[in-house]
Design a protein with these regions (language model features):
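N-terminal beta-alpha supersecondary unit
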Residues: 2-68
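Surface "functional belts" at beta-alpha junctions
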Residues: 26, 93-220, 253-254
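Residues at secondary-structure transition points
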Residues: 34-42, 73, 77, 81, ...
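DPxDG-like acidic metal-binding loop motif
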Residues: 66-99
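Stable alpha-helical structural segments in soluble proteins, enriched in small hydrophobic residues
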Residues: 50-54, 89, 107, 222-233
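Acyltransferase
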Residues: 214-262
């Protein structure tokens, strides 16, 4: 895997806004903020700051990578709009990484850390990783990732298969909305240890009490996009900057405010 490049990484799919710069396969600068409703004001600023920290400009970078979702409608639009603006202005290519792929990369980092620094919430191996994004109430956007490509299981698409070439895990179910109850993901929990990770994991821990279930409540971070972004860039999976749209999973539904103006 070629690592001789620079990639700007933008992650705004949840309440955490983060931007990172990767140089030659290493995160060289990073910014994040969980300030409420600050994505629009901070994302472009963070991009400027990580470039300035390294003494380079956008012209010195090879591409821009953005989280494509699923996630917050507003957050995704801010990230994608910023990334597209950078690409339009510089002529740099755009690559996109699924939010769940980022969470799986974070999970692998947590597992690797647990091998040397034992923790109560993370073991040293999982049959499945189940990343999930909070979709409000008891709903999450989730998919199941397996540590190998089992001969009896078909990888869901070419992108998932490409990601599996470098990652230890591959996606084996479609990304879908799930209403969580005590029986959710039972077929996977019965097969062995499962790690639930993401900003939807916490509420699952309240209802899924299976002994094979472990939970990490966290937000996806731009720094964890390094590996999937590098894979997308190496394989030239570039997006059409003019027409690229986030993967919302569900259509946005506008509601009428109940607050009275007068």
């Amino acid at each position: 895997m070629s690592l001789q490049n620079r990639i700007i990484l933008i992650e705004t799919s949840t309440s955490l806004c983060s931007v990172a710069l990767t140089e030659n396969g290493v995160i060289s600068a990073y910014r994040e903020s969980s300030a409420p409703k600050a994505h629009a004001s901070l994302t472009a600023v963070f991009v400027q700051e990580v470039l300035a920290e390294r003494g380079i400009t956008l012209a010195d970078c090879d591409c821009v990578c953005v989280s494509k979702g699923p996630g917050s409608y507003t957050g995704l639009r801010v990230g994608v709009s910023t990334a597209k603006g950078l690409c339009f202005g510089s002529g740099k290519p755009l690559v996109a990484v699924g939010t769940l792929d980022t969470l799986v990369a974070q999970a692998q980092e947590e597992i690797a850390t647990a091998l040397t620094e034992p923790r109560n919430d993370v073991g040293d191996g999982f049959k499945f990783i189940i990343p999930m994004i909070d979709a409000r109430r008891m709903e999450v956007y989730a998919a199941v990732f397996s540590p190998v490509i089992p001969s009896e299981v078909k990888v869901i698409d070419e992108v998932a298969e490409a990601n599996a070439k470098e990652s230890q895990y591959c996606q084996i179910t479609e990304t879908a909305p799930v209403i969580v109850d005590e029986n959710s993901f039972a077929e996977y929990l019965e097969q062995g240890p499962c790690l639930f990770i993401g900003d939807g994991a916490g509420k699952c821990a309240d209802v899924i009490k299976h002994p094979n279930a472990s939970f990490i409540q966290c937000n996806p971070k731009a720094s964890a996009m390094l590996q999937p972004a590098q894979e997308a860039y190496n394989e030239k999976r570039f997006e059409d900057v003019a027409y690229f749209e986030p993967f919302y999973l569900k259509e946005f539904v506008a509601t009428v405010s109940k607050k009275k103006l007068f």
